[in-house]
C-alpha cells in the first residue's frame, strides 16, 4: 500500500545542528509524507513553497537518513507515491563484448583507454572527480591567458596521456607538465569516459528546446531544470556544473586567450554530447546549447539563505560544571585590559578552539573582545552590550558575558558565522599559566638558560642551512623551468622550419631530378638531415633537463618538509630561552653573568652586553629622557649632532615611548613598546624592566637587528656634553 508524498531537491549544503536534523548535499532528493504537513495545518498548494513551511520532516533518498531539514534550502519537484524502499539503481557501466565476437587491436586499445564511470569516480560532498579537479586547477593556474590553449595539440601521444590519467591522483605533480599536455589530457579525460557528461537520455529534449534558444531567462531556467533532472545521475550533474564553471572562467579572459563562449562550445560540445550519438543535423543546435550555458553565471552557487526560525530546544540544567552566575572577574578565560600583542603571544601555536576574552580596545563600557583560534589563525569577535544584554550580533539575548561564553562552549559558533564551525573548547586560564622556569635558584636557572640557548643556536644553524639550500634550489628550479620553456619554443621553431623545408624540398628535388643535378639533391638532403639532427639534440637536452628538474623538485619538497619539521622546535626553544632570560633579568642578575651563560662574552648579538660602566652618562636619565617632547623638537635638538646621539621621549601612541637617534647624519625615530613583559623595540625583545635598562643595553648593541636602516648604537645621550 502506498501513501501520497512530495519530492524536494537540495539547493545548498546543510550540516545538521541538532540530533533530529539530517545533512543535505547539493542535489539530494528528499521525500516528505503529505500527512505530516496536513497534521501541521498546511493546506494543499503550500507544499510547493517549502520556504514558507519552515522546517520539514522527511527522508533523504540520496543518503538514506530521516529527519528535519530547512525548507529554505530545497526546491519543490512534485508529488510522489511513497512505497517501501527499493534497491538503488546501479550507475551506468559499459556493456561487455558479446561471447564469440573477435576484438581488433583498436578495440583492445579503446577498452584500455576507458575510465571508470563518473558515478564510480567520486561521490558528494565532493564537487567533481579528483583527477579532473587537479587538471582544471593546473590549467587555470598556468594557462588562463594562453592564446593557444585547447587549440594547439601537444607532442604527447595517446599512451603518454593515458599514463598521466592512470597515475595515482595525489602523487601527480602537474606543475612540471606543459600546459598544452595538460589541455590534451583534459580532452582525453572527457573522451575516455564510458558515457558522455551529458547522457544520451536527455539529447532529444535538449534538441527540441534548442531551436527556441533566444538567450532568454525563461529558456535558461528550462534548460537548468532539464539538466538537473533526476534521470541524470547526480555525479553527472556535478561534473557538468564544474566544467561550466571552468569554461565560464576561461571566457572571462577571452581578450587574452581568445576562448569566448562560442569557441569553447565548438571545441567541447562534441566531447560533452558525443555527436556520434546524435544527428549531425543537430550539431549547431547542441553547440548553441553549450554556448548559452557557458555565457550565463547560473553555475555560480549563491550563498545559502538564512535558516528559518526553529523552536528553541528544551533547556536542561547544565551538568558540566559551568556556572552562569559566576562573575566575569572570576572567569579563568577573562584577562581584562591586555593588549592584542599579548593575546597573540598567549594563543601562539595553540589548537583550534583555544580562546580568551579581554576588554574591547574601543574602551566602550561593557564591550569585550573574544579571541578564538581557528584554522591556525586568531579570529577577533566583538561582544556587544546594550540594555543589559550581550551577544555577537542583534538580537542580543544573553544576560552576561559568562552565559554567552558557556553557551558557545557547548554549541558551535557556526550559528553566528558559518565559517566559524568550532566550539570554545580550550580556555587560556589566567590561573593556570605554565610555569616554564621550574628551578628555584639563580645558578640552576642560568645553567638551563645556557642549555636552551645552545640547543636554539644549533637548531637555528640547521634551519639557516636548510633555508639557504631551499632558496638556491628554488632559484635553480625556476631557471630550469624557464630553460624548458625556451627549449619548447626552439623545438617549435625548428619543427616549423623542418616542415617548410620538407614541403619545398620535394618540389626542388623533383626539379633537380629532371635536370639530373644530383649534387643539389644531395645538398638539400644534407641540410634536411642536419636540421632533423639538431631537433633531436635539442629534444634530448630538454629530456635530460626535465629529468634533472624532476629530481630537484623532489629534493625541494624534502627540504621544505624538513624545514617545517624544525620550525615548531625552533619557536618553542626560542620562547623557552627568552622566558628563562626574562626570569633572570627580573631577579636583577647582572648583564656580565647573563653573557657568560649565553656564551657570547666576546661577541655582539641580541643579548651581548659589555662590562657595566658606572661612569657612563646613560645612568643619569636626565641626559636622554626629554619627557613629552614631540618629533619636531627632537629633530631640532639632534640636528648637527654626531651619529649615535639620541634621546627618549613620550610617544604620540598612548602608553609608549619613542627613541630619536642620529644615523648617517639624519634623525631617525623608532617606537619603544611597553608591555606586560617589559620595554623593548619588538617582540620577543620586550624584556627590559625600565627605560634605563633598555638604554644601557643598546649603548653597545646595534639597533640594526630591529631595522636595517638603524645600524647604530645609543652611544651619546643628547644632554651628556652639557652636563659634564
UniProtKB/Swiss-Prot annotation:
One of its GO terms (cellular component) is perinuclear region of cytoplasm. The keyword Mitochondrion does not apply. The modification Phosphoserine is found at residues 154, 279, 608. Residues 113-301 form the Rho-GAP domain. Polyubiquitinated in T-cells by CBLB; which does not promote proteasomal degradation but impairs association with CD28 and CD3Z upon T-cell activation. Residues 84-97 have a biased composition (Pro residues). The record marks 151 as: Arginine finger. InterPro entries: ISH2_PIK3R1, PI3K_P85_iSH2, PI3K_p85alpha_SH3, PI3kinase_P85_cSH2, PI3kinase_P85_nSH2, Rho_GTPase_activation_prot, RhoGAP_dom, SH2. CDD domains: iSH2_PIK3R1, RhoGAP_p85, SH2_cSH2_p85_like, SH2_nSH2_p85_like, SH3_PI3K_p85alpha. Coiled coil: none annotated. Residues 333-428, 624-718 form the SH2 domain. Changing residue 409 to Q: In a patient with severe insulin resistance; lower insulin-stimulated lipid kinase activity compared with wild-type. One of its GO terms (molecular function) is kinase activator activity. The modification Phosphotyrosine is found at residues 467, 580. The modification N-acetylserine is found at residue 2. The keyword Phosphoprotein applies. Pfam families: PI3K_P85_iSH2, RhoGAP, SH2. Heterodimer of a regulatory subunit PIK3R1 and a p110 catalytic subunit (PIK3CA, PIK3CB or PIK3CD). Interacts (via SH2 domains) with CCDC88A/GIV (tyrosine-phosphorylated form); the interaction enables recruitment of PIK3R1 to the EGFR receptor, enhancing PI3K activity and cell migration. Interacts (via SH2 domain) with CSF1R (tyrosine phosphorylated). Interacts with PIK3R2; the interaction is dissociated in an insulin-dependent manner. (Microbial infection) Interacts with HIV-1 Nef to activate the Nef associated p21-activated kinase (PAK). This interaction depends on the C-terminus of both proteins and leads to increased production of HIV. The SH3 domain mediates the binding to CBLB, and to HIV-1 Nef. Belongs to the PI3K p85 subunit family. It is linked to Agammaglobulinemia 7, autosomal recessive: A primary immunodeficiency characterized by profoundly low or absent serum antibodies and low or absent circulating B-cells due to an early block of B-cell development. Affected individuals develop severe infections in the first years of life. SHORT syndrome: A rare, multisystem disease characterized by short stature, anomalies of the anterior chamber of the eye, characteristic facial features such as triangular facies, lack of facial fat, and hypoplastic nasal alae with overhanging columella, partial lipodystrophy, hernias, hyperextensibility, and delayed dentition. The clinical phenotype can include insulin resistance, nephrocalcinosis, and hearing deficits. Developmental milestones and cognition are normal. This is Phosphatidylinositol 3-kinase regulatory subunit alpha. The gene is PIK3R1.
Amino acid at each position: 500500500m502506498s501513501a501520497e508524498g512530495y519530492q524536494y531537491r537540495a539547493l545548498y549544503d546543510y550540516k545538521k545542528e541538532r540530533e533530529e536534523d539530517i545533512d543535505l548535499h547539493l542535489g539530494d532528493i528528499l521525500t516528505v509524507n503529505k500527512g505530516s504537513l496536513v497534521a501541521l495545518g498546511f493546506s494543499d498548494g503550500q507544499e510547493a513553497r517549502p520556504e514558507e513551511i519552515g522546517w520539514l520532516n522527511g527522508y533523504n533518498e540520496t543518503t538514506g537518513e530521516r529527519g528535519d531539514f530547512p525548507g529554505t534550502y530545497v526546491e519543490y519537484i512534485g508529488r510522489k507515491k511513497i512505497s517501501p524502499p527499493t534497491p538503488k539503481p546501479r550507475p551506468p557501466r559499459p556493456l561487455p563484448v558479446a561471447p564469440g565476437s573477435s576484438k581488433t587491436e583498436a578495440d583492445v586499445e579503446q577498452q584500455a583507454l576507458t575510465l571508470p564511470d563518473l558515478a564510480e569516480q567520486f561521490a558528494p560532498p565532493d564537487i567533481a572527480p579528483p583527477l579532473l579537479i587537479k587538471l582544471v586547477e593546473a590549467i587555470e593556474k598556468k594557462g588562463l591567458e594562453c592564446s593557444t590553449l585547447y587549440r594547439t595539440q601537444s607532442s604527447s601521444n595517446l599512451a603518454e596521456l593515458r599514463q598521466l590519467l592512470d597515475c595515482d591522483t595525489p602523487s601527480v605533480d602537474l606543475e612540471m607538465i606543459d600546459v598544452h599536455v595538460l589541455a590534451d589530457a583534459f580532452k582525453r579525460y572527457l573522451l575516455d569516459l564510458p558515457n558522455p557528461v551529458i547522457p544520451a537520455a536527455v539529447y532529444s529534449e535538449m534538441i527540441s528546446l534548442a531551436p527556441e534558444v533566444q538567450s532568454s531567462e525563461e529558456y535558461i531556467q528550462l534548460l537548468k531544470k532539464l539538466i538537473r533532472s533526476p534521470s541524470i545521475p547526480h555525479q553527472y550533474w556535478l561534473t557538468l556544473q564544474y566544467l561550466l564553471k571552468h569554461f565560464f572562467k576561461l571566457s572571462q579572459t577571452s581578450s587574452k586567450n581568445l576562448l569566448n563562449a562560442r569557441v569553447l562550445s565548438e571545441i567541447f560540445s562534441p566531447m560533452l554530447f558525443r555527436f556520434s550519438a546524435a544527428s549531425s543535423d543537430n550539431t549547431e543546435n547542441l553547440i548553441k546549447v553549450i554556448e548559452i550555458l557557458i555565457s550565463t553565471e547560473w553555475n555560480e552557487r549563491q550563498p545559502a539563505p538564512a535558516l528559518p526560525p526553529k523552536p528553541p530546544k528544551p533547556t536542561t540544567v547544565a551538568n558540566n560544571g559551568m556556572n552562569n552566575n559566576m562573575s566575569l572577574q572570576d572567569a579563568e578565560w577573562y584577562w581584562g585590559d591586555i593588549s592584542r600583542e599579548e593575546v597573540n603571544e598567549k594563543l601562539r601555536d595553540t589548537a583550534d578552539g583555544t580562546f580568551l576574552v579581554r576588554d574591547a580596545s574601543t574602551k566602550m563600557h561593557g564591550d569585550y573582545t573574544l579571541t578564538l583560534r581557528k584554522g591556525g589563525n586568531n579570529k577577533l569577535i566583538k561582544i556587544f552590550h546594550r540594555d543589559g544584554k550581550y551577544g555577537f550580533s542583534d538580537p542580543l539575548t544573553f544576560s552576561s558575558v559568562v552565559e554567552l561564553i558557556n553557551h558557545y562552549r557547548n554549541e558551535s559558533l557556526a550559528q553566528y558565522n558559518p565559517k566559524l564551525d568550532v566550539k570554545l573548547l580550550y580556555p587560556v586560564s589566567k590561573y593556570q599559566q605554565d610555569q616554564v622556569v621550574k628551578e628555584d635558584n639563580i645558578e640552576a636557572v642560568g645553567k638551563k638558560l645556557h642549555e636552551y640557548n645552545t640547543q636554539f643556536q644549533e637548531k637555528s644553524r640547521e634551519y639557516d642551512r636548510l633555508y639557504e639550500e631551499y632558496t638556491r634550489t628554488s632559484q635553480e628550479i625556476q631557471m630550469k623551468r624557464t630553460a624548458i620553456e625556451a627549449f619548447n619554443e626552439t623545438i617549435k621553431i625548428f619543427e616549423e622550419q623542418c616542415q617548410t623545408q620538407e614541403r619545398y624540398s620535394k618540389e626542388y628535388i623533383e626539379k633537380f631530378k629532371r635536370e639530373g643535378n644530383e649534387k643539389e639533391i644531395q645538398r638539400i638532403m644534407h641540410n634536411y638531415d642536419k636540421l632533423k639532427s639538431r631537433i633531436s639534440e635539442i629534444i634530448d637536452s630538454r629530456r635530460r633537463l626535465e629529468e634533472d628538474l624532476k629530481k630537484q623538485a623532489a629534493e625541494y619538497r624534502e627540504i621544505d618538509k624538513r624545514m617545517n619539521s624544525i620550525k615548531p622546535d625552533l619557536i618553542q626553544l626560542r620562547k623557552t630561552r627568552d622566558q628563562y632570560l626574562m626570569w633572570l633579568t627580573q631577579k636583577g642578575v647582572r648583564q656580565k653573568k647573563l653573557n657568560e651563560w649565553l656564551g657570547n662574552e666576546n661577541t655582539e648579538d641580541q643579548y651581548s652586553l659589555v662590562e657595566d660602566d658606572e661612569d657612563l652618562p646613560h645612568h643619569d636619565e636626565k641626559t636622554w629622557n626629554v619627557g613629552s617632547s614631540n618629533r619636531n623638537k627632537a629633530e631640532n635638538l639632534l640636528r648637527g649632532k654626531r651619529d649615535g646621539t639620541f634621546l627618549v621621549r613620550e610617544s604620540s601612541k598612548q602608553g609608549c615611548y619613542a627613541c630619536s637617534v642620529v644615523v648617517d647624519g639624519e634623525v631617525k625615530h623608532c617606537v619603544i613598546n611597553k608591555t606586560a613583559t617589559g620595554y623593548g623595540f619588538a617582540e620577543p625583545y620586550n624584556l627590559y624592566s625600565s627605560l634605563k635598562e633598555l638604554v644601557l643595553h643598546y649603548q653597545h648593541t646595534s639597533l640594526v637587528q630591529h631595522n636595517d636602516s638603524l645600524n647604530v648604537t645609543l652611544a651619546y645621550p643628547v644632554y651628556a656634553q652639557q652636563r659634564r
